[in-house]
């Protein structure tokens, strides 16, 4: 199988992180459990149930369910504001043109993933996807990354992960996959590097501009060599 580039979506390809923050702020306020936006932001990209449990300080199950439902409702109301991050579409097309698989390795629910895919408008280059239904616990646990590898039919030595969150880097590392970091989700370079992401770029466009210096280029050379030997 062709080597694969595994992409997180929220905050990595689509400018959605701060809409999630807004939705969670509203949901927590509705329950009389106000949480500062900066605290929520630092949890974005984490498994949803883990985020709720952490920020609600283990509130009763029915409260956690209402929090999740409130987030979904407020997020859906704001999806008209979603947009691809600079260079996102061009990056996906370039990766596909290099003979690599484009895999959306996200733990977003199916309904959110459908919206994100419409925003990206890149269906012709996407090989495989994952969603929240594929694992019981998502990032920072490595399960969703392993599912993405399995769907692509490759091992960790023939893949690289691209993500914007500490949780992305930790999940990728747990599955043995190198991680390229992006600042577009609002997390500091130093934090991404400490979690294992290297190198780190500003956004998809910055990564695209420096693609030849990354593992993506190495995987493309491997794919080209394998194709020539056929």
Show the residue positions of the predicted features.
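Non-catalytic pre-domain segments flanking phosphatase-related domains
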Residues: 1-7, 217-230
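N-terminal helical cap/lid subdomain that shapes the substrate entry/recognition surface
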Residues: 2-100, 122-123
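Conserved Rossmann-like nucleotide-cofactor binding loop
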Residues: 12, 19, 110, 167, ...
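Phosphate- and divalent-cation-binding pockets in alpha/beta enzyme and binding domains
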Residues: 23, 51, 111-115, 171, ...
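Substrate-recognition/cap helix-loop segment adjacent to the acidic, metal-dependent catalytic center
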Residues: 29-31, 51-58, 81, 89, ...
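Acidic, Mg2+-coordinating phosphoryl-transfer loop and its flanking beta/alpha structural elements
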Residues: 106, 160-201
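Structural recognition of alpha->loop->beta junctions
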Residues: 121-129, 191-208
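Short amphipathic alpha-helix with an adjacent loop that forms part of the alpha/beta core around
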Residues: 209-218
């Amino acid at each position: 199988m062709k080597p694969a580039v595994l992409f997180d979506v929220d905050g990595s390809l689509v400018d959605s992180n701060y809409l999630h923050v807004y939705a969670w702020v509203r949901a927590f306020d509705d329950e009389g459990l106000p949480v500062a936006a900066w605290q929520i932001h630092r949890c974005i990209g984490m498994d949803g149930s883990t985020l709720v449990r952490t920020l609600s300080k283990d509130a009763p199950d029915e409260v956690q369910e209402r929090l999740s439902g409130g987030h979904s409702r407020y997020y859906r109301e704001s999806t008209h504001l979603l947009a691809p991050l600079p260079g996102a579409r061009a990056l996906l097309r370039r990766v596909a043109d290099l003979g690599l698989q484009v895999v959306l390795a996200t733990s977003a629910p199916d309904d959110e993933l459908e919206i994100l895919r419409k925003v990206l408008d890149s269906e012709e280059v996407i090989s495989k996807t994952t969603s929240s239904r594929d694992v019981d616990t998502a990032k920072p646990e490595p399960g969703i990354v392993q599912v993405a590898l399995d769907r692509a039919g490759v091992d960790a030595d023939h893949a690289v992960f691209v993500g914007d969150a500490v949780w992305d880097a930790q999940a990728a590392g747990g599955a043995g996959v190198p991680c390229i970091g992006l600042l577009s989700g609002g997390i500091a370079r130093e934090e991404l590097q400490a979690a294992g992401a290297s190198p780190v770029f500003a956004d998809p466009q910055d990564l695209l501009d420096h693609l030849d210096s990354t593992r993506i280029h190495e995987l493309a050379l491997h794919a080209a060599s394998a194709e020539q030997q056929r």
